């Protein structure tokens, strides 16, 4: 951690949340940012701060996305044989932002991010092996019908590598 303590990190991060539109974090990062590892509570606390979208990465249980307009979805991960999880979170974030900048629905952004993260996790290298758009699209096409294809509602969902996504 870059901070002296978890408490110091929370002190420094909390005021910044008032200027944030979208937050992405795993359970540990949510604990630091808003004081809870519970994904639904973390999303509620982030949205209560005025964010438009909260994305909580749930490791092997996928990703939960919640929006200020009341939408809440859990998107399952794509199962892959993990070779090295390093960089999968960066791939998720980059692919998620690609989707946002392309005007996609939040669930599609998460699904695309999950695919990119899964691709990187299935490879030995991380920075040198970031997937291209064509690779992510091919991955998604090969897995049409896989659990990661369709989001499930938070009410029916069971709860990628948490610390690496």
Where are these regions (language model features)?
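Conserved beta-alpha-beta core of the PfkB/ribokinase-like small-molecule kinase fold
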Residues: 1-45, 61-63
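Conserved phosphate-binding/catalytic region of the ribokinase-like
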Residues: 37-165
């Amino acid at each position: 951690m870059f901070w002296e303590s978890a408490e110091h990190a929370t002190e420094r991060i909390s005021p910044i949340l008032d200027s944030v539109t979208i937050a992405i974090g795993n359970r540990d990062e949510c604990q630091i940012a808003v004081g809870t590892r519970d994904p639904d509570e973390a999303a509620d606390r982030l949205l209560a701060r005025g964010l438009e979208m909260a994305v909580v990465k749930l490791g092997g249980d996928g990703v939960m996305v919640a929006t200020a307009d009341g939408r809440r979805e859990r998107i399952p991960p794509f199962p892959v044989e993990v070779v090295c999880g390093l960089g999968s979170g960066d791939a998720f974030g980059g692919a998620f932002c690609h989707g946002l900048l392309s005007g996609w629905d939040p669930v599609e952004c998460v699904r695309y991010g999950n695919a990119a993260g899964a691709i990187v996790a299935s490879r030995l290298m991380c920075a040198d092996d970031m997937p291209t758009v064509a690779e992510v699209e091919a991955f998604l096409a090969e897995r049409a019908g896989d659990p990661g294809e369709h989001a499930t509602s938070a009410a029916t969902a069971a709860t990628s590598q948490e610390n690496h996504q």
